[in-house]
Every structure is written in structure tokens, then in C-alpha cells.
Amino acid sequence: VEEICGRGGTGIYIHADVGVPEEIKHLFRTAAERLGSVDILINNAGITKDGLLMAMSEADFDNVIDTNLKGCFQMIRFASRRMMKQRYGRIINVSSVSGVAGNAGQANYSASKAGIIGLTKSAAKELASRGITCNAIAPGFVKTEMSDVLPDEVKENAKKQIPLGRFAEPEDIANAAVFLASDKASYITGQVLLVDGGMVM
């Protein structure tokens, strides 16, 4: 927010849990009151609770599905109501290569991210007539605090699966989101943009 304001923009911070509908309502109501409209939604909230399928608890499965998939659904539901009235909107959902190809030890996470892809395509078909596009980004490995703690051996093995030979920078994912939110992508909807260095083809 400080960086946005420092560059001459208007930014506000609103804390909300995507699993609590009342907090989501408050988020959109406050954003509309303070900023005037809701034009772009990027669904990026997500958690992981990794474990092998046979040992995974129902609670760990449900928590990941509820946050990653149901939270995305709730955010789209509330945002699209406002976007439909103004007949314009850009919805960008963050999926994952795990949702495209699966990943051992991440049955819950992969299921949630695959669900986001199906949700994206359904929302795109329902909302297109109101001038709203809905697309997904599927990142591969990204340089973040989460990936920084991985053992070096794991990171090197992961890089061997990536034709470009490196993890994505956070800016690589941000650039994809900026493109899909822009007028340059006004004729693109219901698509999944893999930003993974060629990991999944």
C-alpha cells in the first residue's frame, strides 16, 4: 500500500478471511466506498497442508479445499455482483501447475487448484455477456519465502524439470496478472496461462 501511494496511486488495506462471507461482504463494500468501483479481482489466497494421500486427514483435506477453492468461489460470487452492474470486470484466479499435472504429496492442494481451473472456465462462460473476463494463472516454482526454505537438493532437482532452468521471480507472475487485467487481454477469457518456465507442456 505504501508503494502504491508513494507512486501517486490510491491504496487501502482491508483485512478479510476468504472463508468468512461476512468479512468478504465488508471487503467489497469498503473497497467500493473508498475507491468507487471494483474492476479487477485477483484471487491469490491459498494454503498448503502437504502429506501423502493415505495418511492425509479429512481436516487437512477440507481446510485446503475450503480456503483455496471455496474461498475463490466466494470472492468471485461477491465481486461479480458488482461487476455485472457496471458491465465490466477482470477476474484472475491463481491456480498452479499442480492443478494441471498433479503432484505427489499434494492431493488436497492439487485438487483445490484443479477445481479453480474448472471454476474459472464456468465463471467465464456465465459472465462474458456482461463484459467480464475470467482467467487463471498457473505458476510453477516461484522464488518465495516458502520455496527458499526447501533443501538445496530439492531445489536443484526441481530446476531439472524446468526447461528454462530456474524458478520464476514473483514479478513473472505479476506480469501475467497485469496482462490479463489489461485491455490487451480483453478478448481472452476462460483460459489458463501457465507461468512455469516450460515445466508443463
Question: How would you name each of these model-derived features?
Answer:
Residues R81, K125-S129, S186:
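Alpha-helical segment proximal to the catalytic Tyr-Lys
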Residues A136, K159-K184, I188, G197:
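C-terminal helical subdomain
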Residues S96:
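Residue(s) in the substrate-gating loop at a strand-loop-helix junction
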Residues H15-L27, E58, E171-D172:
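The beta1-alpha1 cofactor-binding region of Rossmann-like NAD(H)/NADP(H)-dependent oxidoreductases
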Residues S37, A128, T133, E169, ...:
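Short, small/polar-rich loop/turn modules that mediate ligand/substrate recognition or access, typified
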